[in-house]
């Protein structure tokens, strides 16, 4: 009888150990992807958006300006990184493009250029038949240009104006305002992040010492949370909005992870600042102040260093951008000695 009981306990403990082990996130892997670009010393490329198997890059050149738009976009590169094919979409203007999304076979992008000490922006739909301007306006500076994102497979954009913030939906050639947040401004460049079904943005609300994060879905604002410190960057995962906290010149950093479902918030110290945060699935990627990459799991508060480039250790800490691939992984763009390299990261 004692032997049976002992075996039963061993079996139960084994199940518990397996259960705990199964909760450990899988080891992330980084697979290099051949670059679709061959750029001259005067050219530069910026990834704008990414989906499963495809991405969009803006390729342009420095225009010699000392302020305002410093680049002109020459063309967009539609890139299928799964099979390596790509095609160019000429821009044929003096504008600069920093925000874009896919809309099935179409492209939507926001371009801008200097106009009488202000910034003139346009929302463009690009199809096989040509380009159509859907909306336009002016902003006081380039960091007030609208930011595009996708919600429930529908193109959207966040607009900052003197009267407050607006979220607009793009349906074919029609643009409609679906949310207004009055009496607040953007504390930095117009930035929004989406996991496909919810989205988040930061706003400076009257009377708040620091930024307030708004978490929304197609029905409107789900919740808003005033943050306790200045924000480095922020991101959204399937379940959380993660905000890196701390002033750039501070010695102490932390984060707040806000559960989208009920608003419960976890606050903890971070050994490094969280810069260039991006979320996908159940994880976040970011770089620290030395551009060393890290992966963070908000549901367990586990943080690990991330090895991307295994060929040359000295090339680990180079300027890197992360983009969700829409399937729980990421596409990384790394600038090594003014040459762009790409990796797909499975997390």
Language-model segments: which ranges?
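Bacterial signal peptide processing site
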Residues: 19-21
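Short beta-strand elements that form the blades of beta-propeller/WD-repeat-like
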Residues: 48-49, 53-69, 105-113, 147-161, ...
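C-terminal motif of bacterial Sec signal peptides marking the signal peptidase cleavage site
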Residues: 14-17
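Repeated scaffold domains used in trafficking and secretory/extracellular systems
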Residues: 42-52, 94-104, 139-152, 184-195, ...
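Structural motif
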Residues: 64-77, 115-124, 162-168, 207-214, ...
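A short beta-strand motif characteristic of beta-propeller blades
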Residues: 33-39, 85-91, 131-137, 174-182, ...
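A short helix->beta-strand "capping" segment at the edge of beta-propeller domains
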Residues: 25-45
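Short loop/turn segments that connect beta-strands within beta-propeller blades
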Residues: 80-84, 126-130, 170-173, 216-220, ...
């Amino acid at each position: 009888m004692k032997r049976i009981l002992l075996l039963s306990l061993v079996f139960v403990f084994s199940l518990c150990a397996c259960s705990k082990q199964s909760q450990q996130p899988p080891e992330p892997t980084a697979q290099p992807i051949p670059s679709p670009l061959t750029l001259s010393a005067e050219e530069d490329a910026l990834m704008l958006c990414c989906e499963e198997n495809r991405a969009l890059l803006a390729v342009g050149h420095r225009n010699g300006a000392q302020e305002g738009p410093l680049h002109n976009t020459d063309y967009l590169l539609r890139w299928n990184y799964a099979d390596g094919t790509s095609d160019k979409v000429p821009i044929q203007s003096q504008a600069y493009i920093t925000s874009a999304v896919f809309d099935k076979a179409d492209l939507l992008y926001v371009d801008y250029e200097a106009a009488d000490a202000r910034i003139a922006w346009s929302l463009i739909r690009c199809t096989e038949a040509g380009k159509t301007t859907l909306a336009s306006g002016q902003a006081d500076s380039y960091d007030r240009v609208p930011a595009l994102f996708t919600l429930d497979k529908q193109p959207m954009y966040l607009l900052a104006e003197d009267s407050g913030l607006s979220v607009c939906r793009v349906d074919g050639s029609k643009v409609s305002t679906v949310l207004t947040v009055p009496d607040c401004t953007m504390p930095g460049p117009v930035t929004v992040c989406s996991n496909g079904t919810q989205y988040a943005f930061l706003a400076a609300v009257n009377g708040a010492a620091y930024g307030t994060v708004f978490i929304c879905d197609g029905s409107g604002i789900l919740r808003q949370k005033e943050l306790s410190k200045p924000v480095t960057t922020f991101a959204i995962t399937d379940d959380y909005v993660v905000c890196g906290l701390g002033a750039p010149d501070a010695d102490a950093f932390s984060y707040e992870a806000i559960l989208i479902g009920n608003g419960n918030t976890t606050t903890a110290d971070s050994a490094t600042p969280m810069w260039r945060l991006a979320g996908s699935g159940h994880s976040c990627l970011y770089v620290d102040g030395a551009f060393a990459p890290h992966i963070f799991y908000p549901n367990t508060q586990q943080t690990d260093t991330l090895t991307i480039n295994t060929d040359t250790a000295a090339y680990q800490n180079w300027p890197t951008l992360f983009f969700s691939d829409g399937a729980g992984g990421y596409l990384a763009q790394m600038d090594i000695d003014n040459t762009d390299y790409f990796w797909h990261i499975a997390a």
